[in-house]
C-alpha cells in the first residue's frame, strides 16, 4: 500500500480568533493518519498570544508584525515538516475528508492542486459548488523551493506564487462529486478579506496596514481579545450538514 503523503497545513493569522477556531476545528476532525499531517499556525499580532496544546498543532507567536505577507508565508513554510503544503486560511473551513482528498488527487508529477469542486459560502449560506481559484491550494514544498519561495509581496502575492508554480507544470484542477467536496471558501461578514483587494500600489496603504487598522478599530471597541488566548476549536455552524442538505436539494431540483 502506497504511503500517504505528509501534509503540512499552513495557517497564517492576525487577530481573527473567531474564525481561526473554525480552521483549527477543521484540522482536528480530519480523517487522516495523525502521523502524516500537522497544522502550523503563525500569529504575528503582538497583542495576542495564542495557546493550544496538541501534538499535531504548533503555534508560533511573534512579537512583531511581518511587513510583507510573503515574508510571513516563507517563515511559516520553513517550519513545515511535510512534503505537501496545504493552504489553511484562518477564515476558511474544511470538511473531514479534505486531507484524504488531497492525497487522492496528488500524483507523482503534481506540483499544485486547485479545487474545481469547492464550496463557495457567502454568509449565511452555501451559494454554489464551483471552482474556488487560489483558495485552499496545495503545493509541494519542492515546487515552492524551485520557484524561489513565496514572492515578497502583499496583496496579489498568491497570484504571483501560483503563476510561477504553474510554469513548472503538474497543475491539477481537482474535480469530484459534489457530495465529496471538502474545501469551503468563506465570504461575507467574516472580517477583512484580502481576496478581491488586488495588488498593492502607492495610492493606498498596503494590505498589512489596512488589515492592522481594521483589527485595531475592533480592539478599541472591545471586539478583539488580547493577552493569552486559549483557543477552543469549534465551528459556528454545522457546515457538514449544510453541505449535505445543499447537495440533496440540488439533486432534487435537477
Give the role of each language-model region:
Residues 1-26:
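N-proximal low-complexity "stem/linker" segments adjacent to membrane-targeting elements
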Residues 5-8, 38, 160:
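Cell-envelope/extracellular polymer assembly enzymes that use nucleotide-activated donors
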Residues 22-36:
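Short, acidic, metal-binding catalytic loop of nucleotide-sugar glycosyltransferases
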Residues 63-80:
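Glycine-rich, basic loop-to-helix element that forms the pyrophosphate-binding segment
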Residues 85:
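Short aromatic/hydrophobic "clamp" motif used to bind/position activated sugar donors
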Residues 92-105:
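Acidic donor-binding/catalytic loop of UDP-sugar-dependent glycosyltransferases
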Residues 113-127:
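Short beta-strand-to-loop element that shapes/binds the nucleotide-sugar donor at the catalytic cleft/hinge
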Residues 154-161:
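Acidic donor-binding loop at a coil-to-helix junction in glycosyltransferase catalytic cores
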